[in-house]
Amino acid sequence: MRSFIKTHKRASSLDNSPRKSSNESPENRRNSQGSFGTELSYPSGYPPNNVLKQSSSFEPLHKLTSNKIFSSKLFKKSSNGKTSSSNTSPLLSRSDAETFAPLLSNTNNIPAIKGTRKHEWGDNDDTSESVILLNRTSMSSMSDTNQDTPDTEIVRIHPNSQQGSILSSQTSADRTPRLSLEEAEDVEDYDITKHSSLSRSQSLKKKRNRLARIHSHDDIMHLRSQSSFSSDLLGSGFSPIPEKSPNPSPLPKYERSPRKENNILDRTNLFDLRKISEASYTAEDESNFNRPFTGVAGGETIQITTSIKDSFVPSPETSHKIRFAADNVIPLSKAQIIENSASEADEDDSNEEDGEEESDSSSRFSFENGNDLCGRTASLKYYSTETNTPPLYVNDIYENDNFDDEMNYFDSNEEEDENMDHLYGGDNTALSGFAGMCTLSDDEFDRTNAAISQELSSHSSQSSKGYTERQRGFSKRDSNKSFEDGNDDYDPSNHCRSYHDIYNLSDEEEAQTINKKVTEPRKRKISDGTNKVTKYADMFLLSDDDAESGSQDEDFGDESRENDVKFNVNSERYGVEHTNLVTTQNHNLNPISFKSPSRFLDVSNVNHSPLAYKTPERNILKSPLQQPIKYHGVSSLLDNDIQGTMKNLYYIDETDEDRFLENSAESEEYYLDEINGIPEDFEFSDDENIMRNLSPLSRLNRTKLLAFRRTHSYSDRPLGVLKDNTPLNYKLEIKNKTVTFFDHNSIHRSYSEPFSSSLLHDSRKSEDNCEDRILDNKTLASPVTPNSSFTKPSPSFTQNSSLSPIQESTTSSDASPKIL
């Protein structure tokens, strides 16, 4: 409550404060406020009615608190003798360092919000109590962001020099400043401070630095869009007033040069634009470069001629000026150099610029988006990327042990398998068909031919044919061990020793039988287990292990054995013992083969091939010409080239499959009769037998159909359902018409096509011409629908599966049926 009373007293004192006399000296006003100088003061002849008045919205508290809740005695002391004094706004006595005043006479529209600023930059006394005007901000008043501000001009008077300067946010042809230049100079003469120039320069520097921190990038960009000044002026910054300057002078003023509005500043000017600490429009005459100005920038003294005329009256032709206060002041010659962007700046003045350029040195492209500098702009930069890919080392992916001296990759597992060949009696690299020939490398092929040529060099006298040394016979020792029978018939040139010998093989040589004894490594890999699948039913008894073992055993059939011995002659090492080739009479191997019988279809090869196309059930079959070949037994070129596709399939005789299906069908029919509740001694009528015989589907065909449905069911085998003679009522309602369909079924439901009852009726009339009646389509009339009465159908009609509609009433048939 005490704080509330104090607030009320303070508001009342502000509301009823006496007007100070106009003849009060500036010294007394300055000492009472405790500031270094009053920014705005009016002469004695200035009318007091034009002073800013209190806002109408700011009501005193005794008017706002006239409720019954508050006691009237609380505010009796507020009405004291001070009310007799004139109600002068305290804005005149409590002004800020930079106070804005209206230029037009209509000042009642501008609300004055009163408050106290607790902290202020600069050397001020503790007794300073300035009043803040919250109508405008310091820099945003010069922009168009404040839309609700009345269209009035704001004048700001700076006491930084004896001449002074009037800053205007805008100056147009139809607007005239409220105060003349003479009156402003009189006010400034009264407000000249007696403080030292050093303290004043320091305070101004701090205030401008404060403004530089407040101004955002948007405000600076908005100045560019409003004034359209020359971007060449932004090529360099300007230092603030130095601390040791004996005579502080106003900042230099530059004229704007005509330039297009849509020109975009380059990157150098945009960088310098960020250094601006204070910028404002200044209305000056065009001829004001007369008085020298001294500035220090990095130890360098620069003189720029500026002047302010004593008498100044703004005119409509006055152009806008901009004033800069930046970090550095550089010569005009250097500004031209920066504008041309052709040379580097001085070492003392370009330290900060060099740091900025170094940060963007890696940028290849940089440009600004947008036609004008309005607000924030997006900068897109493209940086150079490395085109050289990093080297790939062996240690990153593979191990060093998997590469030879020529950096050829090899598998260590394969090398271990090759090193184990000495346990089996030598390196046996027998080829396994055409695919094995393609897997040979050039080095292996050359080593094999070199070994054969060394053997043939000592036994070249035995060759009687015109073949090369690579295609001649082996040594005497190898030939005596290799061949026991038929040495005269054996020709080593007929075996494959090169790629071209593959095409010299005949069908008779390919069909020759082989000896039971093969090389040791191949014999160990052959499985001794017999094939368990002998009929169609055995396929369902196989487990997963049996299926895998069966597929592995098939890879080592007669064909692989034949190829192993046939190409075993091309062994790489010297001490390899070759197997013996025997005749067909000594052959005692199982002639079962699962390979596709493509070559056995040739007529010339029938008498020479004991390995005919066989199934696992039969050992010896007839010639392929007399045996029907199934669709999956027909070979193709793909089957001949790729091994292991057709030979792994099971070929089951269809008779065994049909026998299995017939046995299963009979058992299922028995189960269906039992499920349907049909007694065992049930006798079907003769009519049903006749109808069954006349049905287009005979018993044999019907059995095959049932077998097909059982084996080719997509979801599950069909299950029997108990039949009932109760008809299922199906009704169709069409407005006033109702049609009901009844389904007449017998105990044993048989399959029949539509209108079979008419066929049966015709067959009873003339049994001799039964077949002709069936083929006669004239008797196939539309089903008869009774109009009013329904007679009991004949027994033959009851056996039919057709539907008999019942028409209860007649009406239009344009409506759609409705199924209940």
Curated annotation (Swiss-Prot):
Compositional bias segments (type: Polar residues): 159-174, 779-820
UniProt biased composition (Basic and acidic residues): 17-30, 253-264, 467-484
Keywords: Cytoplasm, Zinc
Keyword Transmembrane helix in annotation: no
Composition bias type Basic residues, residue spans: 1-11
Keyword Cytoplasm assigned: yes
Record localization: Cytoplasm; Bud; Bud neck; Bud tip
GO cellular component: cellular bud neck; cellular bud tip; cytoplasm
Residue spans of biased composition, Low complexity class: 454-464
Region (Disordered): 1-54, 158-182, 231-266, 341-370, 454-498, 777-820
Biased composition range(s): Acidic residues: 344-360
UniProt main location, coarse: cytoplasm
Described purpose of this protein according to its UniProt entry: Involved in maintenance of polarized growth and daughter-cell-specific transcription.
Protein family according to the UniProt entry: Belongs to the ZRG8 family.
Protein name listed in UniProt: Zinc-regulated protein 8
Organism: Kluyveromyces lactis (strain ATCC 8585 / CBS 2359 / DSM 70799 / NBRC 1267 / NRRL Y-1140 / WM37) (Yeast)
